[in-house]
Amino acid sequence: MWNISEVVFQLPTSSASDRVLQPLWDYLLLRHYTLISSPFFPVLLAFSSYIIFSVPFAVLDVLGEKAPLFKYKIQKDRRPTVGMMLRTLWTAVYNHLVFVLPAVLITNVVMPMPPLPTVAPTVWEMFSGGLGALLVFDTQYFLWHMVHHKNPHLYRWVHAIHHDYISPFSWSTQHLSGVELMTVGFWSNIDPILLKCHPLTVWTLTVYSIWMSVEDHIGYDLPFSPGHLVPFGLLGGAMAHDMHHQKPSSNFAPFFSHWDKIFGTAITVKLTQKSEKEKQVA
């Protein structure tokens, strides 16, 4: 066990010219070392982020037309019921109890966590490491996702549960089979290790990627969402993933849009409307 009393003497001094994230990292090490050094902390962080980000949109769905943001609802004629929300939430809880927690225990026995570093990452290290991990994961999941939609057996066995609902909602983000959840979890853990990301980078990336995943499934095309704020249509967002649930052979990438554009699987509302008009004319 790493002696926390030694941290005080190992911590680098922080100054205006030093790493701007060092004071935050010092605080986490000194005040919350027991929590952040636990092998269960990443799971707690990811699952609590899923809950926190999903609740506001669950409230919007319950309010329906009364909600001020209902005008941004993509499929206004399809609304999740409380029963659907509870079912998808239970799927997430079940998968974590049956698959994730035992996997964490086994991994910690086979490969214990190394001591946390005393030096914080630079802002550039956090940005470049986080972006790199997102791009790698986006590529992995795009290929995995496309293969599972192309192969009927894989689709039925692994991925079909996620398409139980044509109109996605926040809680359905983790409505996954155990196999899919463990695959996604494996990539989410191994990619930052291969890229040598700092733990603070990994945790920040975890929260941000969970937000992006939930935002993909909220069923609302909000004008202030990342998909609209990031220029050149680089991100997919809620509209792109909603279209995937309506047209499953399109928009396979989880976050970015470049792979779908390269492979010709990118579908937008405008393209869909154009295709429908052409069919009507024909």
From Swiss-Prot:
Looking at the record, the residues that make up the Fatty acid hydroxylase domain are: 133-265
Report the EC code(s) recorded for this entry.
1.14.99.-
Q: Which domain of life is it from?
A: Eukaryota
Report residues carrying sugar chains. Answer: N3
> GO:BP terms for this protein?
cholesterol metabolic process; sterol biosynthetic process
The UniProt entry annotates the motif Histidine box-2 at 159-163
Pfam families registered for this protein in UniProt: FA_hydroxylase (PF04116)
Q: Locate the motif Histidine box-1.
A: 144-148
What cofactor does its activity depend on?
Fe cation
Bilayer topology term: Multi-pass membrane protein
> What top-level class of enzyme does the UniProt entry assign?
oxidoreductase
**Main localization of the protein?**
endoplasmic reticulum
Name a GO CC annotation attached to this entry.
endoplasmic reticulum membrane
Question: From the Swiss-Prot or TrEMBL record, what is one GO molecular function term?
Answer: C-4 methylsterol oxidase activity
Span-the-membrane segments of this chain are 40-60, 85-107, 127-147
Q: Which UniProt keywords apply?
A: Endoplasmic reticulum, Glycoprotein, Iron, Lipid biosynthesis, Lipid metabolism, Membrane, Metal-binding, Monooxygenase, Oxidoreductase, Steroid biosynthesis, Steroid metabolism, Sterol biosynthesis, Sterol metabolism, Transmembrane, Transmembrane helix
Renumbered to this chain, motif Histidine box-3 spans 240-246
Q: Where in the cell is it found?
A: Endoplasmic reticulum membrane
Role according to the record: May catalyze the formation of 25-hydroxycholesterol from cholesterol.
The UniProt entry's sequence similarity note says: Belongs to the sterol desaturase family.
Official protein name in the record: Cholesterol 25-hydroxylase-like protein 1, member 1
Task: Tell me what organism the protein belongs to.
Answer: Danio rerio
Protein encoded by which gene: ch25hl1.1
